[in-house]
Amino acid sequence: MNKLIPLPREFFARDTNLVSTELIGKVLYFQGTTAIITETESYIGNDDPACHAARGRTKRTDVMFGPAGFSYVYLIYGMYHCLNFVTEDEGFPAATLIRGVYVISHNDLYTIYTAKVKSQITDEKTQSIIISEDRRSTKFDIPNLEESNLYLNGPGKLCKYLGINTTHNKCDLINNKDFFVSDIGLNLPYSTTKRIGITKGTDKLWRYIVTDNKNALLNINIL
């Protein structure tokens, strides 16, 4: 693999919408998996009703008030994790939500996923049934790992298959060899839309997604 270099903290310590747009086409590297970021959303400060920090500084949102370039990972509905990158100046709570990635290389995501499911169950017969049924599920569109490229659309799906959870909260993305963002010079076309999956602040055009992702991402190879 070509050597990937983490982005500097200065990249994240800027206007959140600028960071969100410029993250499109950047590489997310996480513990052996390399993926192109394809969809982001901005959550900005106390005046954004959809931003967790709108309710003030809490133990959960403390990382958002800290230095830029750290991960903010939280659990929603008791089952889905979401990955964010802290942005702006320290003291101003803001972050970019990573909503989608296109996997270029991986360390067998399906093996990782099934191992996690099996760890919750002791009966071997039940294990095999659950794994079999879940792989056929359309809810998460479980990918065929015989294909080298995988499109993970949705923050919960992204975290599930990459293995990102709350233990990866508050990770420094600048000084971390296993979890960082890199620039390989990709300039992908993207569209701007209203944010989705929220009930407040729905009028803000703070969602950015690669346009015609199938063609834009086809044949990308950084190995």
Curated annotation (Swiss-Prot):
Record-level Gene Ontology MF annotations: alkylbase DNA N-glycosylase activity; DNA binding
Protein name, per record: Putative 3-methyladenine DNA glycosylase
Lineage: Bacteria, Pseudomonadati, Pseudomonadota, Alphaproteobacteria, Rickettsiales
Keywords: DNA damage, DNA repair, Hydrolase
EC number(s) on file: 3.2.2.-
Family matches, as InterPro entries: Formyl_transferase-like_C_sf, MPG, MPG_sf
Family: Belongs to the DNA glycosylase MPG family.
EC class of the enzyme, as a word: hydrolase
Pfam family, one: Pur_DNA_glyco
Keyword DNA damage: yes
HAMAP family for this protein: 3MGH
Originating species: Rickettsia typhi (strain ATCC VR-144 / Wilmington)
Keyword field contains Hydrolase: yes
GO biological-process terms attached to the record: base-excision repair
PANTHER family from the UniProt entry: DNA-3-METHYLADENINE GLYCOSYLASE
S-S bonds: none
UniProt-listed SUPFAM superfamilies: FMT C-terminal domain-like
